[in-house]
Amino acid sequence: MFGGLSSWLGLKPPEGAAAEGEEPPSRDGDKLSAGAAPSEESPERPVEPTEEQQQQPPTEDPQFLHQAKGLGNYLYNFASAATKKITESVTETAQTIKKSVEEGKIDDILDKTILGDFQKEQKKFVEEQNTKKSEAAVPPWVESHDEETIQQQILALSADKRNFLRDPPAGVQFNFDFDQMYPVALVMLQEDELLSKMRFALVPKLVKEEVFWRNYFYRISLIKQSAQLTALAAQQQASGKEEKSSNRDDNLPLTEAVRPKTPPVVIKSQLKSQEDEEEISTSPGVSEFVSDAFDTCSLNQEDLRKEMEQLVLDKKQEEATALEEDSTDWEKELQQELQEYEVVAESEKRDENWDKEIEKMLQES
């Protein structure tokens, strides 16, 4: 059976099979040769095929066998060529992947796949978001009360690396979101060259990226809070000055109208009482908070100084007027005394004349 199949595919039949197929005739021939004498005498009988001959397939056509052999060779060659090409392709792909992995070019391979396209779109989306955030971000000193001063103080932070290495004090609540402040950090790297150099020197050798920016923005928040407090104190001081100036303007006409009508002695007593009141008012009062006392002192110091100077000037003027009035009274009294002296002298002269005339009259008589 297998011999017929191999002969149909164009392969040579095995020699053992051929020998087995040839054995029966030789045996029959031997038998016939051994029994040659009886066969001559008896009539010829048909030779019956043996079991092996019955099982042996019939002989095939040589042309058909040649075609089958050519077809088998063609299929074998085609399969061999295809297998060789597939093997070479797989080997080449494996070598390319190995080489790309060694050279770090695995991204080039991934870019050619669906995963590479997805990564490209994701990267593009992230870049667009970062661009929008960076365009909207501005330096911390923008829209501040005193931009120039705050800018100089913030830029001065980059000169000392301790501002980046020291963490905020324990217990201080400072909420820092690195993703939210990342665009501002990019803007600051563009604005401050010294900051970029400091970041290159410290990150990640001495401090992590997130800790570096947290400490930096904590110092910036302190600078901005200090500027806000200074501006608030200046506004309070200006409003206090305006209120006091308006109150002073309202009180000036009354004092000017009353002052000339008062006598000098009463003015001195009033001045003393006013000075006592000013001393009492300028004495530090008890306040609930130290900040309240500090604000009142800082706001009223200049006004109190001006008022004291005005009071001293008024006192000097009043003393001068009192002295002038005293001098005029003294002059009047002196003039009166001189007039009385002249009257007495004239009366004495008149008396002497009368005496002389009386003596003359007595002598003549």
UniProtKB/Swiss-Prot annotation:
InterPro entries listed in its UniProt record: BSD_dom, BSD_dom_sf, BSD_domain-containing
Compartments (UniProt record): Cytoplasm, Perinuclear region; Golgi apparatus; Perikaryon; Cell projection, Axon
One GO term describing the cellular component: perinuclear region of cytoplasm
Primary site of residence: cytoplasm
PROSITE patterns recorded: BSD
Disrupted-gene phenotype: Mice appear normal and healthy. Display no alteration on the survival or axonal elongation in primary embryonic motoneurons. Show no alteration in total AKT phosphorylation in primary embryonic motoneurons.
Extent of Low complexity compositional bias: 52-62
Keyword Cell membrane: yes
Region (Disordered): 1-65, 237-259, 344-365
Record's keyword terms, sorted: Cell membrane, Cell projection, Cytoplasm, Differentiation, Golgi apparatus, Membrane, Phosphoprotein, Postsynaptic cell membrane, Synapse
Modified residues (Phosphothreonine): T262
Residue numbers carrying Phosphoserine: S283, S298, S327
Induction: Up-regulated during adipocyte differentiation (at protein level).
Classification via SUPFAM superfamilies: BSD domain-like
Subunit architecture: Interacts (via phosphorylated form and BSD domain) with AKT1; this interaction is enhanced in a mTORC2-mediated manner in response to epidermal growth factor (EGF) stimulation and activates AKT1.
Function in brief: Plays a role in adipocyte differentiation by promoting mTORC2-mediated phosphorylation of AKT1 at 'Ser-473' after growth factor stimulation.
Descriptive protein name: Synapse-associated protein 1
Organism: Mus musculus
Name of encoding gene: Syap1
